Amino acid sequence: MITTRLRSTVTAAALSLGAVLATTAATPAAAPADLKSRAAAPSCPQFQDKVYAAADHRVDVDRITPDPVWRTSCGTLYRSDSRGPAVVFEEGFLPKDTVNGQYDIESYVLVNQPSPYVSTTYDHDLYKTWYKSGYNYYIDAPGGVDVNKTIGDTHKWADQVEVAFPGGIQRQYVIGVCPVDKTTKTEIMSDCRSNPYYRPWH
């Protein structure tokens, strides 16, 4: 079941998701041992490893340009994607090219190309723009690069309020997913699913 504590991590827009997922979610696994052992942990735990959530740890943080501004908040993020939960819940979100992809954040944002990043957004409703993707994923992951704080908010995609994850996102940070009705551009709440591998970490 989805706990009260988990519901508190999602935004108001996602509260209805929690209600739907509560009927199907597996009991969350225990938090990682290193978090349990911390005394007086901050409200949003920070990790020395900036790519702690990465699905592919071959990512080279030193190659990221310009100097990234790392996200330090714990709010829910979202990602529109064409892959269904049978794939994402098993694999997480893997980047297209961790080794040889475009590491410059501005170049990656302005021109869609293979990169070590997986994009997410602060904006729950952005899926309405990318509704043809088919699914709106809810993500609770530490870190990520705040794109607008890194390259400014005057670029043409600034309204997407992106958080880019170098190395992608491991499956345990995906809360769940709602399919999107491509006609009405709304989430099909009755078909939302929770991720049995999701592990709360804060």
What are these regions (language model features)?
Residues A19-P28:
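C-terminal segment of classical bacterial N-terminal signal peptides
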